[in-house]
A protein has these predicted regions:
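C-terminal beta-signal and adjacent terminal beta-strands/loops
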Residues: 683, 692-708, 727-729, 735-810
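Gram-negative outer-membrane beta-barrel transporters
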Residues: 591-594, 613-702, 807
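Periplasm-facing N-terminal accessory domains of Gram-negative outer-membrane beta-barrel systems
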Residues: 35-125, 129-131, 463
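Surface-exposed extracellular loop regions of Gram-negative outer-membrane beta-barrel proteins
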Residues: 376-377, 423-434, 476-497, 508, ...
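Short loop/turn motifs that connect adjacent beta-strands in outer-membrane beta-barrel proteins
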Residues: 177, 234-235, 250-255, 275-279, ...
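Periplasmic N-terminal accessory/gating domains of Gram-negative outer-membrane beta-barrel systems
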Residues: 97, 109-112, 125-231, 242, ...
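Transmembrane beta-barrel wall of Gram-negative outer-membrane proteins
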Residues: 262-287, 300-336, 344-366, 372, ...
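Outer membrane beta-barrel strand-and-loop segments of large Gram-negative receptors
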Residues: 396-400, 441, 445, 449-451, ...
């Protein structure tokens, strides 16, 4: 079988595969504990004294020697080279009281913990970034965006429901599928090319209400990182981006709570010590009550409808001495839509993970994680003649081990293994006893993916730094299953010439590939840097769908004989400049992305119930390029950002659009975003967002023809030559807070207006007959037809939409 450069099918018995993996595990365990000791270092962690949350980006240095300073990482951890003892170690962080501690030589044998007390801040000291002020200048990361949770909460919200994905859509390089959706399209990649993970476990459907809200409750989150490029070697599996979401650690000192009562939903989060101060918990729940409003309707049919969602999440952490931490994370989310007892659609996610973090020594760290993620949906049609129940389920389980070794103050390496097992259960359509529909059961799909990875961070000089990585993946499609064969290995409808059955765990197809990652940063001065990066990613799962927004019933496909893994290669170059003592940040990033083996549907494709989905899709190439500009203000009474993105996205697939290149639906060349937040005083603040983007690419009919006295639209062979009108919208919010000092119960009222000036942004166009020049005329109910003509009806979701939310803390 011919394949593209970069990966190839190979014949390797599973026993040999497992021998390779076993050798790698043994080797890395030995390597992790056999490195010799380097120059002694002091290690520790920095926490908020009130909430016990780790402080990211705190400054740590020896008194009188700031040049030796370091900053804390994502878990509040740090390592600093020892000096002559005794010596004073200084910990500082904006908005907190400084801590100074005398360190003795023996303190290097154990980890140190610092708890900083918050201090009263003036408005000029308010910051919007949970990071050090010059981070964008000095770090190696390109294409990474971190949005603090407090910033997300300050953005005006649809229905008053603060939303993570809707906030990420405001960042440069991130597109949306249209009004009222949370689907993300990052640098020309489709929605299924984003790896969304919660505490390291993947989430396969990250939206509620058909994409209007994301599944994450911001009250329970500690951080959100979006990687648009230059993904670390320890991550992989998707072609375009990583959205890394982390739950908070619970407060280890006292019970704390927060929540909100909104227009269509309410939420509550509790956290505190579990069994003393060496353990903690956080649990969070959210539920909508949209279905309760339906019961107030005068329409009996509406009163019988149901529309709701809920989600529950939690994290339980146990600190086992000075060196070990064990944490358990859980998430469950569910949606249900019921129409007058005739139709029911439910879908849910179940995600859980366990993480063990160990400090082996001052320079050696180990993380071990196991996880399980499941997504399923059920469709129930209650009809005497055509009733049925349709179910589908997919799951991913995995284990990941990661070793980190600090070789010196200039070099750090990490390496590890990541094994994943995919189970895509069959589509099962079970007809009711009296139904005239036949039973449909498709074959299950299973895949095993084993990855080895290695990364190096190297500082060549104070100006030049490098991050290099290599990831190798071996993918095996395994039985139980059935594989169809076709003439010339080209799947065609009704063209199969045979089948082959495989037993459980019997290998069916192999793919393997190397994924190099490389990034450089050159520091021109303390306020100006240049960065460049290259990365390759492989993706072994894809969605076959005719909806760009993403639906709960989308068909997921595993790589097999006919559907090859996506290969993504991206290069990027960026300029980063800070001004006015790091109050202002300016960045300009350009990128080019090459995609191979992306899929699209044939004309008239039906992918939901077929067992031969490979006959409904075609694969080919894609590419995307663009320039992202971001100007951000970090401190002061007014904070926020202004961004502009120019980008183009293309596909070229044999058998689609007359084999010519075309734009996918989510190609939107121009994107302008403005986000502002202003603090008038400790009680009052206001937020404003403005969004302008090019319209979605679509295919409009070029004419019509008559069938049974009805006009049927005639579509061209060339795809997406037309566009929706440009999209623009302004949102605004005002927040009042109870700022009285010393109160245990703190409340705030948020008043938001979505689509402030009532722009009717198109959601869809319907091409159909218009009777009697009335788009609402129904021939079966409204009388005789006097005239008819082919017409188009535009649907929009929202005009001006006000909301109110009460938020509280205790």
């Amino acid at each position: 079988m011919s394949v593209r450069q970069g990966y190839s099918p190979i014949q390797m018995p599973l026993l040999s595969v497992f021998r390779v993996i076993t050798f790698w595990i043994s080797f890395t365990f030995c390597l992790g504990f056999s490195f010799g000791q380097n120059a002694p270092k002091i290690r520790g962690e920095v926490f908020d004294a009130v909430s016990s949350q780790p402080l990211i980006g705190a400054n740590v240095y020896w008194e009188g020697n700031t040049a030796s300073g370091v900053v804390t990482g994502l878990d509040g951890d740090f390592e600093i080279i020892s000096v002559t003892f005794p010596a004073k170690l200084v910990i500082s962080y904006i908005g907190y009281e400084r801590s100074v501690r005398v360190i003795q030589a023996k303190d290097g044998e154990k980890g140190l913990r610092f708890f900083l007390k918050p201090e009263e801040m003036s408005l000029e000291e308010i910051i919007i970034q949970e990071r050090r002020p010059d981070e964008q200048i000095k770090n190696l990361e390109m294409g990474k965006a971190s949005v603090p949770i407090e910033t997300i909460k300050n953005i005006p919200a649809l229905f008053g429901e603060v939303d993570l994905f809707r906030s990420l859509q405001l960042l440069p390089g991130v597109q949306t599928a249209g009004e009222g959706t949370t689907g993300l399209f990052v640098r020309g990649g489709s929605a299924d090319q984003n790896l969304v993970q919660l505490d390291g476990a993947p989430v396969y459907n990250a939206s509620h209400f058909f994409g209007i809200f994301s599944v994450f409750n911001p009250d329970a989150l500690s951080k959100v990182d979006l990687y648009k490029g230059n993904m670390p070697a320890s991550f992989g599996g998707r072609a375009s981006s990583l959205i890394d979401v982390s739950l908070q650690e619970g407060n280890r000192n006292q019970i704390h709570g927060q929540g909100g009562i909104g227009t269509i939903s309410s939420r509550l989060t509790l956290d505190g010590p579990l069994f003393g101060k060496n353990s903690s918990f956080i649990v969070s729940g959210r539920r909508t009550y949209a279905d309760l409003f339906l019961k107030l309707s005068r329409d009996e049919n509406l009163r019988n409808n149901k529309l709701n969602f809920y989600d529950l999440s939690g994290r339980f952490s146990f600190f086992l001495g000075e060196r070990d931490k064990l944490s358990f994370s859980i998430y469950e989310g569910s949606d249900f839509l019921g129409l007058d007892d005739q139709f029911g659609l439910g879908w849910n996610n179940w995600v859980n993970s366990v993480n063990w973090n160990r400090v082996n020594s001052e320079t050696s760290f180990f993380d071990l994680q196991a996880y399980y993620s499941r997504y399923q949906y059920i469709v129930d049609i209650n009809d005497p003649e055509n009733g049925f129940e349709w179910t589908n389920r997919l799951s991913e389980s995995g284990i990941k081990a990661n070793w980190i070794r600090v070789l010196s103050d200039k070099s750090t390496i990490n390496w590890g293994i990541h094994s994943q097992f995919y189970q895509f259960s069959p589509v099962d359509l079970a007809p009711d006893p009296e139904s005239g529909i036949g039973e449909i059961v498709t074959n299950p799909k299973n895949g095993l993916l084993n990855n080895l990875f290695f990364g190096l961070n190297q500082n060549f000089s104070p100006r030049l730094s490098m991050e290099a990585g290599l990831r190798w993946g071996l993918y095996t499609q395994v039985g139980e299953g059935v594989e169809y064969s076709y003439p010339d290995d080209r799947p065609e409808r009704d063209g199969e010439i045979g089948t082959e059955s495989f037993d459980a765990w019997e290998p069916m197809q192999f793919y393997q590939g190397l994924e190099p990652r490389l990034a450089f940063r050159y520091l021109i001065d303390e306020q100006f840097s240049v960065k460049a990066a290259y990365n390759r990613n492989f993706q072994y799962v894809q969605i076959a769908t005719n909806s760009s927004a993403g639906l709960p019933i989308d068909r997921w496909m595993l790589a097999d004989r006919y559907t090859r893994p996506i290969q993504s290669d991206q290069i990027s170059l960026g300029l980063f400049r800070n001004f006015d003592n790091n109050r202002w940040e300016l960045s300009v990033e350009g990128y080019y992305k090459d995609l191979r083996n992306v899929i699209d549907l044939r004309n008239g494709a039906q992918v939901l119930f077929t067992d031969q989905v490979e006959t409904e899709v075609l694969s080919g190439d894609g590419w995307a390029y663009g320039v992202e500009t971001l100007l951000r203000k970090n401190t002061g009474k007014t904070t926020g950002w202004l961004s502009y993105t120019w980008s183009r996205t293309w596909r070229q697939i044999e058998g689609v659009s007359l084999n010519q290149k075309y734009n996918p639906r989510f190609d939107r060349p121009h994107d302008v975003t403005l986000v502002l937040n202003h603090e008038f005083n400790p009680r009052w603040s206001a937020g404003l967002t403005f969004v302008y983007t090019s319209g979605l690419a679509v295919t409009f009919p070029v004419g019509s023809y008559v069938v049974d006295n009805q006009n049927v639209p005639l579509y061209p062979e060339l795809r997406n030559l037309d566009r929706f009108p440009d999209y623009h919208r302004m949102d605004a919010s005002i927040t009042w807070r109870n700022a009285d000092k010393g109160r245990k119960w703190k409340g705030s009222w948020n008043f938001s207006v979505y689509n402030l000036y009532g722009r009717k942004n198109p959601f869809a166009y319907e091409f159909r007959d218009i009777y009697n020049n009335d788009i609402n005329f129904n021939p079966s109910e409204d009388g005789d037809i006097i005239s008819s003509r082919p017409g188009v009806v535009m649907t929009y979701l929202f005009t001006v939409l006000p909301s109110i939310t009460y938020n509280f803390q205790f």
